[in-house]
Amino acid sequence: QTDLKFRLSYGKTGNQDGIGNYAWQPLMSGGINYGNNSGMAVTSMGNNKLTWETADQYDFGFDLGFWNGKLNMIADIYLKNTNNLLYSMPLHGTSGFTSITSNIGSMRNYGVEFSINGHLNIGKVNWTSSFNISHNKNKLTKLLGDDLLPIGSNRALKVGEELGAFYLFQMDGLYQYDGEVPQPLYDLGVRAGDVKYHDADNNGIINDNDRVLTGSSNPD
């Protein structure tokens, strides 16, 4: 006997994780001293445009069974679009704050999952085997300003890239002799045997402007 079952679903969910009760407005508190005077200061930066993160997810799959369930295959495909993505966005140090909870853009998750299992009974022997494989990806489809947004020391957000992609200096090998070291770097003490970093903007200086996106830690 062969059994075949199809599954199709759609769901819409909201997420408010990370949004405090008063995250939409700045907060002030007393007990702040400056010199010999006491006063009040802003202790929390508000965001009056903050809203829920929403996600629309589509799923399609099928279950296929052979020989009264002795061999079964299960496959699923999903697509999830998340809008108003909640993120703790870094702020410039001059603001007096390190970050602010914001709706920074949109993200798409998609993937395929497949599994197969078999059951075999021979006398007193009960044999069960299973195998599964999956492929899951995500990418940012929209970002505030559509500009690259560094986060932390070695990651960044960019439209078309995975969430939290690595943002690193690319190594091009080692300097073999002092003569090939660009003068600005030579003046800084770089010599033969030191790492040769890729000069992305070709100005002879290695700084944060030379970092590039180089994949992510998310497995396939």
Predicted regions and their residues:
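Conserved small-residue
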Residues: S102, N121-N218
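Acidic/histidine-rich catalytic neighborhood
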Residues: D3-G11, N103, E113
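Outer-membrane beta-barrel signature, preferentially recognizing the C-terminal barrel domain
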Residues: W24, G31-N72, I100-I122, G160-L168, ...
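Transmembrane beta-strands of outer-membrane beta-barrel pores
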Residues: Y10-G14, I77-N83, G118-L120, I133-K139
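Flexible, solvent-exposed coil segments and beta strand-coil junctions
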Residues: Y34-T43, M89-S99, N202-V212, S216-S217
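Membrane-embedded beta-barrel scaffold of Gram-negative outer-membrane proteins
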Residues: T51-G96, W127, S134
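Outer-membrane beta-barrel and related beta-rich outer-membrane complex signature
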Residues: Q16-P26, L85-M89, G93, T128, ...
